[in-house]
Amino acid sequence: MRILVSNDDGFHAEGIQVLAMELRKIAEVIIVAPDRNRSAASSSLTLVEPLRPRHLDNGDYCVNGTPADCVHLALNGFLSGQVDLVVSGINAGCNMGDDTIYSGTLAAALEGRHLGLPAIAVSLDGRQHYETAARVVCDLIPKLHHQLLNPREIININVPDLLFEELKGYKVCRLGYRASSAEVIKQKDPRDETIYWIGPSALPEDESEGTDFYAVKNGYVSITPIQADLTAYHSLLSLQNWLEQEFTK
């Protein structure tokens, strides 16, 4: 098996290096990742400047682009040979609930899905036990690879920041919800000009049993299938009825 590994925290982040080291015990691995932190880049592509992949001595690449750029280039450009699976992570911090809208970690996996490959995104609910998340991925891949990895979906995995032996198990979950985002942070720069920072993530609003928030909070690895189709199917009929009523008066 040949695995393409990417992330949004950047090539030099601890999470991706720990993940690649563990995956190389079970597969051939090549990293193609951003050359710096690209957190919250979502699925953005770079269209107004050239992308410059830098080939490193060990065969990996870092790119002056977004996570989606990295996977797009790797699978649709310069990377030769067959790739069987895309794994994105390990993200420093969870990607649960509404986080998935912004996540560059998920975006890298979704780009792999868009290009026809099964893909996994993995995040750690903290910044300490990356080796736990890496072991979780290596434990799941042989079980998932041939059966449940649909090229039209990705698997989103969130791991509690615990020792591997302290994990309570795995739970298949839906996404939870966060409350409205916190206010932006207003400051003054050294020139006394006003600047703003995006505030921290809001607290969970729906962390009921069955959600990814609930699972991770209670020591379980959450596993959530994610699709790119954003259609609200439950609203199609009501919108169709509204359209017919409003325009047939």
Curated annotation (Swiss-Prot):
InterPro entries: SurE, SurE-like_Pase/nucleotidase, SurE-like_sf
Note on cofactor: Binds 1 divalent metal cation per subunit.
Recorded catalytic activity of this chain's protein: a ribonucleoside 5'-phosphate + H2O = a ribonucleoside + phosphate
Listed GO MF terms: 3'-nucleotidase activity; 5'-nucleotidase activity; exopolyphosphatase activity; metal ion binding; nucleotide binding
GO cellular component, one term: cytoplasm
Pfam families: SurE (PF01975)
Protein name (Swiss-Prot/TrEMBL): 5'-nucleotidase SurE
Functional summary from the UniProt entry: Nucleotidase that shows phosphatase activity on nucleoside 5'-monophosphates.
Chief place where the protein resides: cytoplasm
PANTHER family named in the record: 5'-NUCLEOTIDASE SURE (PTHR30457), 5'_3'-NUCLEOTIDASE SURE (PTHR30457:SF12)
Cofactors that this protein relies on: a divalent metal cation
Family assignment from sequence similarity: Belongs to the SurE nucleotidase family.
Top EC group: hydrolase
Protein's cellular compartments: Cytoplasm
EC code(s) of this entry: 3.1.3.5
